[in-house]
């Protein structure tokens, strides 16, 4: 069941730190096992910036601005999704990573956020140019969710409180 919580987000380049904080805070509020998720976009030329701060960068400059500002830099990028699962005692974090590049001009209409800018390695299309099924088959978020699923199949007792 989806629960819409307004949790203040800590500022960190590391998505793992953001997710751990969000998971603990969410559990504190709902008092039941809960899953949270966040993503980061790590640009090699900027030593990993904006990382977990991508939401704030996108709010400030938007898709066009981010593509434009990277014009003269190495556009090699890693995108990372972290899913945090908290049972009140501990937080398990599951990570999915996809390597690729930030394209200069946004392409595509699907997805959200920076999807029109991110082109996975080995693909000629951005996430936003892909059908949802195609993107989901390779996405960083799906990799993290599959890791969580695999963990829960092996350790269902983690959800016992």
Residue ranges and their predicted role:
Residues 1-161:
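Anionic-ligand binding patches
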């Amino acid at each position: 069941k989806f629960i819409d919580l307004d949790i203040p987000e800590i500022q960190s380049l590391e998505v793992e730190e953001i997710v751990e904080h969000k998971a603990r805070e969410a559990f504190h509020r709902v008092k039941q096992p809960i899953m949270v998720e966040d993503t980061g976009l790590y640009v090699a030329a900027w030593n990993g910036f904006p990382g977990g701060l991508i939401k704030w960068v996108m709010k400030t400059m938007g898709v066009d601005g981010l593509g434009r500002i990277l014009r003269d830099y190495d556009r090699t990028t890693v995108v990372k999704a972290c899913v945090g699962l908290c049972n009140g005692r501990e937080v398990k974090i599951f990570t999915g990573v996809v390597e690729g590049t930030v394209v200069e001009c946004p392409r595509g209409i699907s997805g959200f956020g920076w999807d029109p800018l991110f082109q996975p390695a080995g693909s000629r299309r951005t996430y936003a140019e892909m059908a949802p099924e195609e993107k989901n088959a390779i996405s960083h978020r799906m990799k993290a969710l599959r890791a969580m699923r695999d963990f829960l199949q092996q350790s269902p007792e983690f959800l016992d409180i």
